[in-house]
């Protein structure tokens, strides 16, 4: 990473799918400048595991897990009785998930450009449902959430799955979906039409502030998953 120094200012959007060594200081400053100037950001799946000691990054991603995080990473953030809960400072891990399984996602804001026209509830293909996430960021819009069922070793809470983050004038879309396995056959979550469509819509919104993509006919329903095995 020591020689990696992309020119972020050349882009409208940065998609974060990285969970490794800390970036060089120059690169971190360049990224923060991009964000503060209004560049769009997508936080994808395990990117919220990265950089536990980078305070500004953790505000940008909203919440995070794993990577050595614990109580100092901030309170647990989840839904309770239909509202965001920010004040759960109880002890425990930061980041977990039960068995990979299918689960229903519920829309938290049907008028947001990313979710407008999508079903109020839809069944996602087998994936990790992140739970027990902690953070210091400001969650703006909960786009989709899912119940982390204890029968699949979940938290028993309504967990945020897709949301936006309030951070200056940038637009940030965070999705915890999309676990990638070691082979095409082990990438069921990424084959889900719901995952693909919401990622593309979230990326367009983060880059431009609007969504022009129509909802495809093969979007999942509340009871039926929909796979695009060729990723198209």
Language model features with spans:
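Alpha-helical scaffolding within the catalytic cores
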Residues: 1-5, 29, 156-162
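Solvent-exposed loop/turn segments at secondary-structure junctions
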Residues: 1-2, 19-23, 41, 47-51, ...
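Short acidic/histidine-rich motifs immediately flanking catalytic phosphotransfer sites
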Residues: 7-14
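Catalytic beta-strand/loop cores that center a nucleophilic Ser/Cys/Thr
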Residues: 79-171
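Oxidoreductase and adenylate-handling cofactor-binding alpha/beta cores
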Residues: 58-60, 107, 120-126, 130-138, ...
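Extracellular ligand-binding/catalytic regions of CAZymes and related secreted enzymes
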Residues: 150-232
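A glycine-rich, often tryptophan-bearing local segment used as a flexible ligand/cofactor-contacting loop or short
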Residues: 21-113
């Amino acid at each position: 990473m020591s020689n990696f120094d992309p020119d972020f200012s050349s882009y409208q959007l940065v998609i974060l799918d990285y969970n490794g060594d800390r970036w060089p200081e120059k690169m971190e400053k360049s990224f923060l400048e991009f964000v503060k100037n209004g560049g769009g950001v997508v936080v994808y799946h395990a990117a919220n595991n990265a950089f536990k000691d980078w305070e500004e990054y953790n505000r940008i991603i909203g919440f995070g897990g794993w990577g050595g995080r614990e109580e100092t990473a901030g309170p647990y953030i989840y839904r309770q009785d239909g509202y965001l809960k920010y004040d759960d400072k109880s002890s425990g891990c930061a980041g977990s998930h039960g068995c990979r399984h299918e689960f229903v996602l519920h829309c938290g804001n049907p008028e947001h450009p990313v979710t407008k026209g999508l079903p109020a509830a839809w069944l996602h293909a087998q994936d990790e449902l992140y739970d027990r996430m902690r953070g210091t960021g400001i969650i703006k819009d909960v786009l989709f959430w899912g119940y982390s069922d204890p029968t699949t070793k979940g938290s028993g809470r309504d967990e945020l799955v897709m949301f936006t983050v309030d951070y200056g004038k940038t637009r940030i879309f965070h999705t915890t979906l999309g676990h990638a396995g070691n082979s095409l056959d082990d990438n069921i979550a990424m084959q889900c039409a719901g995952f693909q469509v919401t990622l593309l819509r979230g990326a367009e919104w983060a880059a431009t502030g609007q969504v022009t993509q129509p909802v495809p006919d093969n979007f999942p329903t509340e009871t039926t998953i929909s796979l695009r095995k060729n990723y198209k």
